[in-house]
From Swiss-Prot:
UniProt-recorded name of the protein: Small ribosomal subunit protein uS8
InterPro entries in UniProt: Ribosomal_uS8 (IPR000630), Ribosomal_uS8_sf (IPR035987)
Keywords: Ribonucleoprotein, Ribosomal protein, RNA-binding, rRNA-binding
Source organism of this protein record: Acidobacterium capsulatum (strain ATCC 51196 / DSM 11244 / BCRC 80197 / JCM 7670 / NBRC 15755 / NCIMB 13165 / 161)
Subunit relationships: Part of the 30S ribosomal subunit. Contacts proteins S5 and S12.
Length: 132
């Protein structure tokens, strides 16, 4: 099965796993998905992630994070830039997500980073998604 938007599929799988209270989820691996998972781990939204190989295919295993009252660290995820409607912004147009309580994940000429990092480094790029 070919996907037209693998990042949206990745975010949807995370959203569905959180709603079903799963501890982990497996998705087909890619470099971009691994970078998104790295940022989510650095920002404290997931517990961990690792890339493994099963049946000859690369798998990205994401371990979700829940609080003491079984509340997920991720409240919601939304895809911003889509294959049919790319959203590019300059360094001066980067806005805070949910009043600073969330993050935006961007691809820039310097790699995948949060909107906060891009603002600090003075680079713009494509907004992939927002997480809060």
């Amino acid at each position: 099965m070919s996907l037209t938007d693998p990042v949206a599929d990745f975010l949807t799988r995370i959203r569905n796993a959180i709603r079903a209270r799963h501890q982990k989820l497996d998705v087909p691996a890619s470099k971009l998905k691994a970078e998104i998972a790295r940022i989510l781990k650095e920002e404290g939204y997931i517990a961990n992630y690792k890339t493994t190989e099963e049946e000859g295919r690369a798998i990205l295993r994401v371990y979700l994070k829940y609080g003491s009252n079984n509340e997920a660290a991720i409240r919601d995820l939304s895809r911003v830039s889509r294959p049919g409607c790319r959203v590019y912004i300059g360094r001066d147009e980067i806005k805070r997500v949910q009043g600073g309580l969330g993050i935006s994940i961007m691809t820039t000429p310097r790699g995948v980073m949060t909107g906060r990092q891009a603002r600090r480094e003075g680079v713009g790029g494509e907004i992939l998604c927002e997480v809060w």
